[in-house]
Amino acid sequence: MTNVTVLGAGAWGTAFGQVLADAGNNVTMWAIEPEIVEGIRDHHHNGVRLPSVKVLPSNMTATGDRAEAVANADIIIVAIAAQFARVALAEFKELIPETALVASLMKGIERTTGKRMDEVVMETLDLPADRFAAISGPNLSKEIADRHPAATVVACTNLDNATKVAEACTTSYFKPFVTTDVIGLEMCGSLKNVTALAVGMARGAGYGENTAAMIETRGLAELTALGVAAGADPKTFFGLAGVGDLIATCGSSLSRNYTFGANLGKGLTVEEATKVSNGVAEGVPTTDAVVALGDQLDVPTPLAYQMSRVLNEGISCSEMLAGLFGHEVTGE
């Protein structure tokens, strides 16, 4: 049996822990909240973050002790909120076994540095690229927790190590594919959240299919241009991690980014939408980072820029869309 540790027991971390357990691994969840640790360890239930799953697999346990969590780990999965990753992972730097692979479920761009999560993880843990993997795809945590059929992509510069991580999370209902395009996977996972915010806002404001389709396709063009400028393979953006994740995130009330945007479209302020949000909408802190990244790479980011105005200036959905359209005729 492979020993797998999941750092972070939120909804997605716990749902993915269940996938790993269903795949036959020994799974240890690490959390800082004592009530979550006790719930998973003693009752096989995460009533705080994933109450819909009444009984988690018996080969899942939990601890709040960092050293205990990673001591015997073959694979370590990072499922921490993106903006807190650097601080949280610093506590594990001297504890992680030298042979362990580290895989990230995180989707976001670090606001303070503009760096992708692969860069943050490898810098913080002093980890070589061939021991890091990113996992991303159309993976809404509630559906994965309910064991609905789904697929994802595992990226690592070392394809053998990508395969090891993929094998550890392969079940009858969860199918991972592998690639070496870490940059592409990271860019897809991060940038689609900004598009989901915009689509959700348009839906919340009462706009229909044409508007949503326009935002999604322009969002895809924007994130593809950014990704390619950063060194990604353009094909990645038209697969599961790109178009696939965009479809899932922009079309479901299960998506926290879509729901956050919908609440903005209904007239809630950013502060009000944050209060009623169930979990972290990573697109909110990522938006400004995407605009800054576009400036750095000399790539226009009109959608991210308009959503930045929404979040920072409080402009309305109609104003956001008017700004997105502009007045000049351009090529698609």
Describe every region a protein language model picked out.
Residues 84, 95, 120, 124-131, ...:
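Internal alpha-helical scaffold of NAD(P)-dependent oxidoreductase catalytic cores
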